[in-house]
């Protein structure tokens, strides 16, 4: 299969939408990471997503829509869930809801009685879904377990000749996947951190929201409710090690010639890394998160690199999502001075 690159022109997106209508898989941009789009009501198309990614069959898929009205056919929506969608959609929030009997393929749900939905803030994504005329599944458009793609080039690296097309809308803005909140139960639970934070959810809901993202792993015989909970995710082939700001100067003393550092600009300046490559994470939590997967992918492709040392961020705001993804990429391996 030859993979075609589409621009975000009207004609290109309509052509990409027809491919999805016809059961093909097309990667598409969102504000978080690039997704792998296929008709969520076509089991043959859904299977192609699992094959392209090498994704375990019990890892549920997120359904992606262009309009919240599309959900009513598939799920039961509480007043609280609808309030979240009204406030945060389009945006970086995925909501888990109870399905209506027989309305969602078990390939999407992993056999659960719930399904996750998202309405992305990217115009090209929503236009593509409208062109396809159906809700689409939208897992990250990377080989399963590897760092998520934040550019069309990242998607091409993993998916060339495995999928029908890629819609290129440049780099994503957020850089990590959406927040996942389980609204199928009485007390909402965050299962994956993202740009939408626990305090923001609690402010809208006016109720307690449990953050389970530090204890969200599940047993090997249990189907996870959300992606990222059960299997290794976000991990390059290279060794990744986290480090704290207070350990930076000690780390500099033990860096091997083929080690590299990913850190904020002030940290790179403090470490004075004249003899080592360094990947800038910018000056803010937002720029750091935007650049995390791009840096991991860049160094993973360099055969000369041995270890990637990455600065941890303060666990506030989107910094919590940054540390979550970094911890998984590193297998929770931290530098010890």
Language-model regions, residue ranges each:
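Active-site-adjacent structural elements in enzyme catalytic cores
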Residues: 1-337
